[in-house]
A protein has these predicted regions:
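Primarily short, surface-exposed interaction patches in extracytoplasmic proteins
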Residues: 2, 24-37, 71-72, 121-129, ...
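Acidic/histidine-rich catalytic neighborhood
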Residues: 141, 145-196
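Short, solvent-exposed loop/turn and secondary-structure capping segments
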Residues: 18-28, 51, 62-64, 149-152
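Active-site core of glycosidic bond-cleaving carbohydrate-active enzymes
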Residues: 38-77, 93-98, 104-125, 129-137, ...
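Extended, hydrophobic/aromatic-rich amphipathic alpha-helical segments that build helical scaffolds
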Residues: 6-18, 112-120, 137, 141-146
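Aromatic- and acidic-residue-enriched carbohydrate-binding clefts of CAZyme catalytic domains
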Residues: 90-101, 168-175
Length: 376
């Protein structure tokens, strides 16, 4: 298993340095051939490039993030047209920043906090005032939209997220309330935006603090399993809810554990997904997402197994490309997710005291690495 992991890790670094470090965000097939009409997807930039500052290559990510500045007026107009403050980052777009029409993409929101997360990774790799000066304006404007998008539920005395299609795209925008990954991401990114205000010498936004304090906890069922959304009460009975991305695992994995989540319920959820998920309907980045969740929950054997699970969409060809199907023989978000997961499994995260937390402690693994940084 170690030899195959090394092969995938080495080849992925080359493939991503060539194809996921340009002046604009990469499309999912990089420069090899066109996918989705040559458009790129902003919810994928985290998967393509979050690994770069964690592996000591911040300059690659900062090069791409310059593009966000050029399309800020377009993103601001998207938010204004929809009645929101701040800027709303597009889902599917091109170098010009024009939003591509879509009955799904226009309702996605998980691309929104990515800019805050990626800017924070750049700051952590180089905690210099110049980084704050360079990115803080867009961090704050991104957070303004996030606050405006959340709805205050006076009856429940809480903030909710609705009117969106989650990362698990099998759910409806019109009925979905409080998808778990997006809730956790809102909690994380709004906190980071406040920290950036303090780093810039500004006061915390009290309204944002109220959102952070009153954001809804993740919804669960009577078996202690987290739901695909608060309204998705049939999550574990309807195959629509157990196909596509198991985004609930991203709530802890991509993101750190937080007060919205019970660790025991998340462990229950991981085990159920492990045993029962419709793995034939997954994508390449679902496996590193599962590995990161398992790592943070203290399940290193599952972390390794997730990265090497014998499924079609977790296939890595001799050239290192993450094969999905005959249409998508190249899928770089899978490669990027692999490198991010390996960074977490080796270097851990803030407050982690376990050496190489993503690898089993059975005496069979001798893990050596250098130059990796912990995740938040």
């Amino acid at each position: 298993r170690a030899k195959e992991l090394e092969r995938r890790v080495l080849l992925s670094q080359y493939l991503l340095a060539i194809q996921s470090a340009g002046s604009v965000p990469p499309q999912e097939t990089g420069l090899t051939y066109n996918s989705w009409f040559g458009k790129f997807h902003l919810e994928m930039i985290w998967w393509h490039q979050a690994w770069q500052p964690l592996w000591g290559h911040s300059e690659l990510l900062s090069h791409t993030l310059e593009w966000y500045k050029t399309v800020e007026p377009i993103a601001r107009e998207v938010a204004r047209r929809q009645g929101f403050d701040g800027i709303r980052w597009m889902k599917m777009t091109d170098p010009s920043g024009v939003e591509a029409p879509s009955s799904v993409g226009s309702f996605l929101i998980w691309q929104q906090p990515h800019f805050i997360y990626l800017a924070e990774l750049l700051y952590r790799s180089n905690p210099d005032k110049k980084v704050i000066e360079k990115y803080n304006y867009l961090v704050q404007e991104t957070a303004k939209f996030m606050y405006a998008f959340a709805t205050y539920d006076e009856l429940g005395v809480r903030f909710i997220l609705k009117g969106a299609i989650p990362a698990q795209e099998t759910l409806n925008a019109s009925t979905t309330i409080n998808p778990p990954f997006e809730l956790s991401y809102w909690y994380f990114a709004m906190q980071i935006a406040q920290i950036w205000r303090e780093r810039a010498g500004e006061k915390r936004n009290l309204e944002w603090d109220e959102l952070i304090d009153k954001l809804s906890p993740l919804a669960y069922n009577e078996d202690g399993l987290y739901l695909a959304a608060e309204n998705a009460i049939d999550t574990y009975k309807d195959i629509r809810f157990t196909s596509d991305h198991m985004a609930v695992l991203g709530a802890v994995g991509i993101l750190p554990m937080n007060k919205l989540i019970r660790e025991d319920y998340m462990k229950n959820t991981l085990q159920w997904i492990w045993d029962n998920w419709n793995w034939g309907k997954t994508w390449g980045w679902d496996y590193p997402m599962t590995a990161m969740n398992a790592t943070r929950l203290g399940e290193p054997e599952k972390a390794v197994e997730a990265l090497l699970m014998n499924k079609r969409t977790n296939t890595y060809l001799p050239n290192g490309h993450n094969y999905q199907d005959p249409r998508l023989r190249v899928y770089l978000p899978g490669n990027g997710g692999l490198l991010t997961a390996i960074a977490l499994m080796c270097a851990g995260w803030d407050g982690c005291e376990i050496e190489n937390p993503g690898f089993p402690k059975n005496g069979k693994w001798n893990v050596m690495w250098e130059g990796l940084s912990p995740m938040p």
